[in-house]
C-alpha cells in the first residue's frame, strides 16, 4: 500500500506486488543468507581449503529477451557469479576468483518465470506457524485433557500432555511417550537444574519414581532411555557416540529446529528472552512449556485457536526459492569435496572455477519449477486469470494439508481472515476452502504474517488527523475496527451514530467515539475476482464464489466491449496484467502498423515497441494486440498504445452487453438452458479465435535418423496437398481433419518374410528396392480444422539441417457461439445454449428490437443472486443514456435501498430522455410488456428486460463433443476405455440401465452389455457379418465382466459354476442346476 502524499489517503497496490516483493527479498537477502551458510571445505590431509565469500555476488543480464525465450523454448535466466577462494595452508597462499555457479530463473514484469519456454508461477503457501500451541480435548470419560504441541520449522511435532495425576509426558510419536524429566535430562539438565528452573517444583517431585531417579541419574542413562522409547528398540542398548549422532539427526534436528519465526513465537507465548539467533529447542523451552501446561490444568492462561491467522505463516516465493538455493548449495558442497579429492589423487593443481560446476544449481531450479506442486503453469485464459493466479494461497503442498484429510473447521472462514484472505473466492470441489485468494490490500510481512491496512483515528480529533497502519492478525485483536468508512455517517451527528465494528473476533455495534481504527476501502475484504462483481452485496456468497471462478474462464472475444455496469477495478486489472502496450516515455508516434509502433524518444532516439500478433496461450485462446494510436499523435508516459485480448481502452472487457429477457420460452430455457438469437452468430458478437499447437519430434533410431520429407508412399495426394518441398505444411494453408501437417519417415528393419508377395516379386525380377521406412507423419486430429498461422522449426544446438529436434505447427480456429456452448453472467448465473432462434421469432420490445438472449426467471429466487436484476436494469438505462456506471459494493450503508433507488432513478431518466414510457412503468418498474415474435401477441405478464454483461466461457462444445465407432479396450475388463483423449466409449451405468429397462428395450440393452462392450467373440462376429452380410448371431456365453467376477471370487477361494439359460434349454432339469 502506498500513501499518495496526503495523510490518510492511499492508492490500490499493484496486483503483482506480492510476487515482486518475494523475488526481491530472495535476491536481496535470501541469496546472501544461504551463501553465508556454505561451509569451508578441506581435503583429507587438510592442506587445501575452499570457501565462498558472501560479500559480493553478481547476477548478469540475460543473454536473450523474454519473447525469444518463449519462442525458442529456453529458460529466461541470469548467470550467478560469486567470489571464491582456495587457500593452501602450507604456503598460506590464497587464490581468489569470481566463479560461475549456475543460472537462476528471473521474474518478469508479470510476476512469472519462463522455464523451457513456458510461463510458470509460484503459489504462496499457508502453513502452521512453528511455535507452541495449547489445546484441550475430552477423553472417553468426559474429562478435559490439556496438551501443548511444539511444531518445528520442518513440520515435526513434539507433544506435552498432562494426565489426571498431574504427571507430564512428552509424546514423540502417537505411541511412545516418556517423562518430561527424562527428556530434560537427555537434553543436558540434572534434577537440581530442572527443579530450579520451574515454577511448580513440588509437582515435578511428586511424580518422580525410583525408576525415573535411576534414569535421570546421569545424562547417558537418560539418553539411552529416550533412544529406546523414540526408536522402539528392544533389549539393552549400549551408549555410544554413533547413538548420540543418530538421536541428534533424527530427533533434535528434525523436530526441534524452530527457525527464526518459531523462536520468536515461543519467546512471545512463554514470556522468554532467549536470543533470536538461537533457533533450536532448548531445555529451558521445555520446562517453561510444562509450567504453562500446569497453569492450564488449574485454569490459568488461554487456549490457542489453531485456525487463527496469527498461528499461520505464509511460505512465500522468497522462502521457496531460498530453500531450493540452499539445497543446490548442499549438492554443490558434495561436488566440490569429490573434485578436491580427485584433483589431489591425480596430482592436479585445482583452481576455484575448476572445483565448481553449474549443474547442481541449474538442475535444482529446473526440477523445482517443473515438478514442485506449488510451481504451476500460468493460466493465461484471459488477463484476469493471469493476475488472480499469482495471488492464490494454498494449504496444499509439501508440509501442508491434503484435500482428503483437511477437516471442515480448517476450510471455514475465520474472523481473522477479514481484510487478508477473501471470504468469497475459493475453488469448488474437494479443495474448497484450501485454496484461497489474497484480499486486495493484503501484504506479506517480514515474519510471514498477512498484514492488512487500517486508518487510525486519534482520540482528540478524529476528523483532523488520520494515519494508516498495517496490522498483523495478532495485533488487530486489541482494537475496535469500524467495518464501514466515515462517508456512511452524517457529518453533523457523526459522534452520536452507532457503527458496525469488529473486536476480538466478534461483530458488534458501537458508538463512533469508541472506534480505534476503520477500514480504508470498500473492496478491502475481497479478492480481485470478487471485487469485479457489481452489486455483490445482493448475491448469495455461493453464487459470488461461482462468479469469481467463471470470470477466470471467460474467453477473449474477437470484438471486445466494456461493461456498462462495473466496479471501477477493471482498469487496474487490465494494466497490471501486462496485456495492453503502455508508453514507457512521452513522445510522438512516428509509425504504426499491426506489427510495431515506433515512438520518438529523447533527442534523435526512437523507440520501437513490438506488438503481440496471434500468440497462443496455454489454454489455446488468442493473445493479440491492436494499436490504439495514430501516426503524428503526441502521447504521455503511461498512455495506452495498444489494447490486448479482452481489454478496451485499457479496461478489462471479458464479455458483451446484450439485450436479455427473463421469461420462460417453450421449455427451451428449462434448468438453466439459454435461448439465443441468430444475430449473436451472424453478427460475430460471441466469436472467438482459438490457436492450437501440434508438435512432432524427430529422433535418431538404431536404424538411422528419421526424415522430414514430402515423399510419403501409400498416402493419397489429397492428404499431402498442403506440404512444401521440405515436407512441412505451408503458412496460410486451410487444413481439415486427417491432413498431413508434417511428413515423416522412420527407418525400420524388415525381414524377408514380412514383405508382401508383390514386393518380393519386384525385388527378384526387376531389382527394385522396396522402402523399409514406416510412415509416422503428424496428422491433424478430429476437430482441428483451421488456418495455419505459424510453423516453428526448433533445431538442436549444433544439429544438422536434416535432423531438427521439434517442429511445431500453430493452427487458428474461428469459433462462433453454438448450441452446447456455456455462457455466464457475473453473478453465478450460468447456462448452456439450447437453441438458436431466427431473429424474427425472438420476443421483441415495444420499439421493435428483438432480445438477444432469454434466461429462465426461476434461476433467480432460489439461487438468491438478485444482483443480476440490478445490473440488468441499470445496464438498459446506461445503454439508452450512453453512460457507464462504476459502483462500489455495500452502498446500502449510505442509505436504505440505495441500489434500488439508483437503478429506478436511472431508468426514469432514460424513459424521459428517450421518450419511451415503457422503459420505466411505475406499476411494475424495471419490467416491460413484450411481444411474441412468432405471433405478434403480447405475453401475459410483464417481463424484466435489460442489458447485463454476459461472458462466453472456455467450456465449449467443440472441445467436449465426442463419438466412438472403434477404439481401444481395457486389458482386464475388456470394456472400452474412458475419456475423449483415449477415444473412449460412453459408460452405461446402473441408472441408465434402469431407464432402458423402463422402456422395455431389451435388444438395445443386450447390445449395450455385450456387442458394444465386453463380449469378445460376439463383437468379432459383428465385424464379420457387417463385412460379409447376414444376421448378427446372438451371444451364447457370458460377457467378460461376468468372467472377471468369477475369477475374482475364485481368488477368494469361492468357486462359482454357471450356465446360460436360453429359449431352447429353458425347461432344464432343476437337479442339474
Swiss-Prot record:
Its EC number is 2.7.7.6. InterPro entries: DNA-dir_RNA_pol_bsu_ext_1_sf, DNA-dir_RNA_pol_su2, DNA-dir_RNAP_su2_dom, DNA-dir_RNAP_su2_hyb_sf, RNA_pol_bsu_bac, RNA_pol_bsu_CS, RNA_pol_Rpb2_2, RNA_pol_Rpb2_2_sf. It comes from the Eukaryota. Keywords: Chloroplast, DNA-directed RNA polymerase, Nucleotidyltransferase, Plastid, Transcription, Transferase. It catalyses: RNA(n) + a ribonucleoside 5'-triphosphate = RNA(n+1) + diphosphate. GO terms for biological process: DNA-templated transcription. It is found in: Plastid, Chloroplast. GO terms for molecular function: DNA binding; DNA-directed RNA polymerase activity; ribonucleoside binding. Its main location: plastid. Belongs to the RNA polymerase beta chain family. In plastids the minimal PEP RNA polymerase catalytic core is composed of four subunits: alpha, beta, beta', and beta''. When a (nuclear-encoded) sigma factor is associated with the core the holoenzyme is formed, which can initiate transcription. DNA-dependent RNA polymerase catalyzes the transcription of DNA into RNA using the four ribonucleoside triphosphates as substrates. NCBIfam families: PRK00405.1. This is DNA-directed RNA polymerase subunit beta. The lineage of its organism: Eukaryota, Viridiplantae, Streptophyta, Embryophyta, Tracheophyta.
